[in-house]
Amino acid sequence: MIEKLIFYMGYPFVRYALIVGVLIALCSSLLGVTLVLKRFSFIGDGLSHVAFGAMAVASVLNITNNMLFILPVTVVCAILLLRTGQNTKIKGDAAIAMISVGALAIGYLLMNVFATGPNLSGDVCTTLFGSTSILTLKIEQVWLCVVLSVVVVVLFIVFYHKIFCVTFDETFAKATGIRADRYNLLIAVITALIIVLAMNLVGSLLISALVIFPALSAMRIFKIFFSVTVCSVVLSVCCAISGMLLSILAGTPVGSTIVAADIVAFLICCMIEKIAGGK
């Protein structure tokens, strides 16, 4: 097995896939703790459906680099989703359901009406659940992922204390002069960036798992925000690497294998919590 891994690591596309996988896992887990604590977990699910709709439009328009179209559309929808959720007539969960289901339906409709290839079901399945496209990345795509990942990490580090305050008590944050609405907007925009980055890795339907599972796993062991965030990052990166290597060796779907690794990590953390609690 070790020899087989060394053999595969000799290929540039495998190294590119591991780099992108680690960066995506890092970014998604950084914000995951905040989204779970703020009960924004499903915003990732909603934006992933929006990204699916944007990808369908890009496919119909024959846009060569669809990332340049999907990214701004998802960011704009993240802002609209946040603004709509603050509307007293439409609550947050209803706004997410409305936008996500609408984008998913319109995207699938466009792919049916303006089918660009003979294998429609394969294209849809690939978009929803991820594909081997992570193993066919070009160096330009890797650099784009690196740049966006650096942006996400820098924004999180620079505004860490503000995000911390807004996460736990918006009323207190406002009382201390923090513009909570601006930082909620920042969280939504960063989430949109992460969603777009993760689409090639796990597909639009499984993206939420990368955000939620590492955070929930870390919360089983640690109770301090910083410790939970660090643990979440470590678990997410380890699960991404192990999932991708197992996928390469066993020939299983990349996204599903990574999510399965996250589930196993969550179950192990739950066992550790029970054992520690028993003592």
Task: Explain the meaning of each model-derived region.
Residues 137-214:
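Helix-loop-helix "hairpin" substructures at the membrane interface of multi-pass membrane proteins
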Residues 1-26:
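Membrane-interfacial amphipathic/re-entrant helices at transmembrane-helix boundaries
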Residues 4, 96, 100-157:
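Transmembrane helix-bundle core of multi-pass membrane transporters
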Residues 18-23, 67-72, 94-98, 142-147, ...:
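Hydrophobic alpha-helical transmembrane segments
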Residues 20-28, 54, 58, 69-77, ...:
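Alpha-helical transmembrane segments in multi-pass membrane proteins
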Residues 200-256:
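Transmembrane alpha-helical segments in multi-pass inner-membrane proteins
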Residues 33-48, 52-118, 218-230, 247-251, ...:
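Short loop segments and helix-boundary regions at transmembrane helix junctions
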Residues 255-259, 263-279:
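Cytosolic-side transmembrane-helix boundaries in multi-pass membrane proteins
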